[in-house]
UniProtKB/Swiss-Prot annotation:
Cofactor binding notes: Binds 1 [4Fe-4S] cluster per subunit.
Protein name: 4-hydroxy-3-methylbut-2-enyl diphosphate reductase
Subunit structure, as described in the record: Homodimer.
PANTHER family xref list: 4-HYDROXY-3-METHYLBUT-2-ENYL DIPHOSPHATE REDUCTASE (PTHR30426:SF0)
Record EC number: 1.17.7.4
EC category name: oxidoreductase
Organism, scientific name: Escherichia coli O9:H4 (strain HS)
Highest taxon in the source lineage: Bacteria
Binding positions ([4Fe-4S] cluster): 12, 96, 197
Cofactor: [4Fe-4S] cluster
Binding-site list for (2E)-4-hydroxy-3-methylbut-2-enyl diphosphate: 41, 74, 124, 167, 225-227, 269
Length: 316
């Protein structure tokens, strides 16, 4: 059985930065460190940080006075940010800079009195944070997930209308929704480049190339990871058997029985150690050496806050 690896796969710059912020805060300040929501959507990462003293909470009221609080990579609403400011807390922001870019787009629209439409998945923390940047009572902020949502939507003023997108969506699905928005509201204004981040786009391109060769595609990522789910869905749309797995233990032997080629990729919040474990398990099931496919090179780095720029080895 041939094993192919998608390229790129795994951690993106925003996830790297968010995890480093929590790790460095633990190294500098010691446990406990409070993190609002899972810092990234990966069970292995969250469990590892929890073992080292990170406490993951959903409400600011759960954080004691004087504590260290970190916002997750998904971002938070202005209401959450203001609540944290009103408390005696030291706050570090691990929001991905590409999510912050979308927040700024919404805030500008709010200041101008433009109504805004966000393309995204209801209930996702990134969507909640982005929707929460809009505060103009004279305007309006709306969420759509599909072209059907667009055709049902009524706004106050079609002349002053803009749209934004969640950063981890399906490129193909989002294109369909944007097309519907432009037909429904001809004067709508969008970002010069859509808000889907480079890592989401690159990993979807990579899984498309992977699925062209592999009979079965394994996507390493947690069930609550939006970008990981989109990778599995894309492979399935291409007619391949695709499975979203947290780790190697989730692999069922019948998935790869009599399969000649299996492909492996990982969502942007999944560490490479999990991919290595998946490859090792596939090799136990008869797989050969893992062959990485060619793909886009990624060299983007997002700096951590200057207060947390430390060599952890020196602290240890």
């Amino acid at each position: 059985m041939q094993i192919l690896l998608a390229n790129p796969r795994g951690f993106c710059a925003g996830v790297d930065r968010a995890i480093s912020i929590v790790e460095n805060a633990l190294a500098i300040y010691g446990a406990p460190i409070y993190v609002r929501h899972e810092v990234v959507h990966n069970r292995y990462v969250v469990d590892s940080l929890r073992e080292r003293g990170a406490i993951f909470i959903e409400q600011i009221s759960e954080v004691p006075d004087g504590a260290i609080l970190i916002f997750s990579a998904h971002g938070v609403s202005q209401a959450v940010r203001n609540e944290a400011k009103s408390r005696d807390l030291t706050v570090f922001d691990a929001t991905c800079p590409l999510v912050t870019k979308v927040h700024m787009e919404v805030a500008r629209a709010s200041r101008r009195g433009e109504e805004s439409i966000l393309i995204g998945h209801a209930g996702h923390p990134e969507v909640e944070g982005t929707m929460g940047q809009y505060s103009n009572p004279e305007g309006g902020m709306y969420l759509v997930e599909s072209p059907d949502d667009v055709w049902k939507l009524t706004v106050k003023n079609e002349e002053k209308l803009s749209f934004m997108t969640q950063t981890t969506l399906s490129v193909d699905d989002t294109s369909d929704v944007i097309d519907a928005l432009r037909k429904r509201f001809p004067k709508i204004v969008g970002p010069r480049k859509d808000d889907i981040c480079y890592a989401t786009t690159n990993r979807q391109e990579a899984v498309r190339a992977l699925a062209e060769q592999a009979e079965v595609v394994l996507v390493v990522g947690s069930k609550n990871s939006s970008n990981s789910n989109r990778l599995a869905e894309l492979a399935q749309r291409m007619g391949k058997s695709a499975f979203l797995i947290d780790d190697a233990k989730d692999i069922q032997e019948e998935w790869v029985k009599e399969v000649k080629c299996v492909g492996v990729t990982a969502g942007a919040s999944a560490p490479d150690i999990l991919v290595q474990n998946v490859v090792a398990r596939l090799q136990q099931l008869g797989g050969g050496e893992a062959i990485p496919l060619e793909g886009r090179e990624e060299n983007i780095v997002f700096e951590v806050p200057k207060e947390l720029r430390v060599d952890i080895r020196e602290v240890d």
